[in-house]
Amino acid sequence: MIYKTIVEGTTKVSVPVPPPDATFPPSAAPVFYNPEMELNRDINVAATAAFVERLLAKKELLREEVRYVDAFSASGIRGLRIAGEVGIHATMNDWSPEAFELIKENSKINGLEENTLATRKSANVLLHEQKYHIVDIDPFGTPAPFLDAASASVRGMLSVTATDTAPLCGAHLKAGIRKYASVPLNTEYHSEMGLRVLLGACARELAKHEKGMLPLLSHVTRHYVRTYLEVLPGTKQTDRTLKSMGFSIHCPKCGFRGPVYGLAVHIEKECPVCGSFTQIAGPLWLGPFREQAFCDEVISELEMHPLNTKDKAKKIITFCRDELDIPMFYDQHVICKELGASATGIEILIEALKAHGFEASRTHFSGTSFRTDAPITEIKEIIRALSW
């Protein structure tokens, strides 16, 4: 295997380069490095740094006492960046013997042997054995089989990536039900559906360990969902968290959507707007998927670090911060297609909604999506008026 040196942030690592005549996809290599996830890792550095500052502000821990684990490390790039750029101890785990050796080599390259630990174990075994302040689950595919062990291990922040967006978003319905014990719907807001299904799964797994959660930052970018959750121990926090769980109603005929809070609820099957039969998604997370103050802290950390994707990262976090806390978003183009109307600039539509007395904002999910508390009938009337 040929290796090359790459640089992310201030961290250098040696990563394998599959031969040009390889008959397997890059993800099937003995050690997988994905350059497309640099943005994810840049945001991870800033978000982890922001959370560590919160931990240190409580004056219960020293920086050298904070423990972070990357349960699926491959080359070690994610954990090494946390150790070197955030300055806390990082455990990097991978079951692959090739990855285990490469992690140790890359630790030496960065002079981080004293601040890191390489382990070669099943992720679930390691997480059931050890407690960590920050647990990072970034597997290839679904994180579902590892959420229980991660919930048992975590003491401060749980960071989770999911790349199985088809099951999460409803494109592969049965797989989504099997993995997440939730019914997703493949709607125009399927990306938000996937995020809320994942958050709901995390909330339910944490609840089994009498832990609640506060979503600090969540985003859907390219082919993956990523979330950072502050973990709050105790039954009161757990019960408070579960109050943000529920179901989402969707009318495929008129576009109505609305939340129903609670895990044991009666849901009317008829759409309150047009009387058609509705579809039901859930259980899923209906609460905010980010904390505005934390977003500001992450943006500040992004400014302080030399990052290749800084501008893209800041744009994503800013959009997340400024979104309304109203599930689920609307897509202007979908509504315009239904009405046979011409689309205007998204900012023009948002200002028109506000002028009519409604709340409205853009979202980070797409350039044509928006949130509002306006009823679907009012949204359509405003779009019709703007298209003339």
Swiss-Prot record:
Its EC number is 2.1.1.216. GO terms for molecular function: tRNA (guanine(26)-N2)-dimethyltransferase activity; tRNA binding. It catalyses: guanosine(26) in tRNA + 2 S-adenosyl-L-methionine = N(2)-dimethylguanosine(26) in tRNA + 2 S-adenosyl-L-homocysteine + 2 H(+). InterPro entries: SAM-dependent_MTases_sf, Trm1, TRM1_arc_bac, tRNA_met_Trm1_C. S-adenosyl-L-methionine binds at residues 41, 78, 94, 123. GO terms for biological process: tRNA N2-guanine methylation. It comes from the Archaea. Residues 4-383 form the Trm1 methyltransferase domain. Keywords: Metal-binding, Methyltransferase, RNA-binding, S-adenosyl-L-methionine, Transferase, tRNA processing, tRNA-binding, Zinc. It is an enzyme of class 2 (transferase). Gene3D superfamilies: N2,N2-dimethylguanosine tRNA methyltransferase, C-terminal domain, Vaccinia Virus protein VP39. CDD domains: AdoMet_MTases. Belongs to the class I-like SAM-binding methyltransferase superfamily. Trm1 family. Dimethylates a single guanine residue at position 26 of a number of tRNAs using S-adenosyl-L-methionine as donor of the methyl groups. HAMAP family: tRNA_dimethyltr_TRM1. This is tRNA (guanine(26)-N(2))-dimethyltransferase. It comes from Methanosarcina barkeri (strain Fusaro / DSM 804). The gene is trm1.
